[in-house]
Amino acid sequence: MDVQAVYRKINEKLQFLVNKSVNHNRQQSSELEWCEKKKELAAKRKAEIVKATCLIKWPKQIEDEATVVDYLCDYRLLYKQGDFLYIEEIGEERVAKFSNKGHLISDEVKLKDCFHKDEEDDWSNEEWHGKDERVSFQYDRLKSVQYAERWWNSRNPNYPYFDVNCTNYVSQCLRAGDAPMRGYPNRSSGWWLANNNWSYSWSVAHALMLYLSTSKTGLRAEEVSSPELLKPGDVICYDFQGDGRFDHSTFVVAKDKSDMPLVNAQTSNSRMRYWSYEDSTAYTENIQYKFFHIIDDNEDS
């Protein structure tokens, strides 16, 4: 099979990201649209992508007769924002289709839906308060960010994994910072994972948003008005359609030159991504955000 055709296509994307012109066909248009969104968002922030690389990871074994091959692309984009340099990383799942003669027919990103379709909607705002006694909480932001950096593009075998894994990943990061769990075994109460089960707030973006909006003990947060007020270790929730249903969560790991959050996330695995998601295929003009600053006993006192 002509895997070199895949390399050529990916290389064209990399060239386009760093403002080099490329010759492209109709099949490339959606790919280059993604690149254009990246470049436009960078320009809006008075930044530019100055270098782009990609490591392609093929399956360990590919059958000679295979016509459909799933593979991974790990992108590294170097941004320059004034005198500030940082690297955004993207883990992309792709599928390449070849003819019986080995010619490349198509090569596309495997798009994922952000929303849990199989989870129940039996959530009550009142339940998220819970009736637990006060739980002591000292948040270790450094440990939570270290965890986010370690696992952004892989699965921790000590936790469950979902096709839509964004909120599960954020919950793991919070737990790594010593956030206390409460509410077990009621899935509609508190925030917890135990005995091969978990609360809705652990794994579902909308439920986590409800929990952080109302929790008064244990893991809790203050909703702030703008992203500049967030710190590494905080959480952003996204309602892409603006319909009141939040369907994505990210974890703040750093700030850029303008003091804006850079986030890690899963489902579409990314590291040090600009918080607004204006470069996402899920982005709409109706998008709504909630910015949660995690508070502990030190900030309460």
Curated annotation (Swiss-Prot):
* InterPro entries named in the record: Amidase_6
Pfam families for this protein: Amidase_6
Kindly give the PANTHER family that the UniProt entry links to this protein: EXPORTED PROTEIN, EXPORTED PROTEIN-RELATED
This one is known as: Uncharacterized 35.5 kDa protein in gldA 3'region
Q: Which organism is it from?
A: Geobacillus stearothermophilus (Bacillus stearothermophilus)
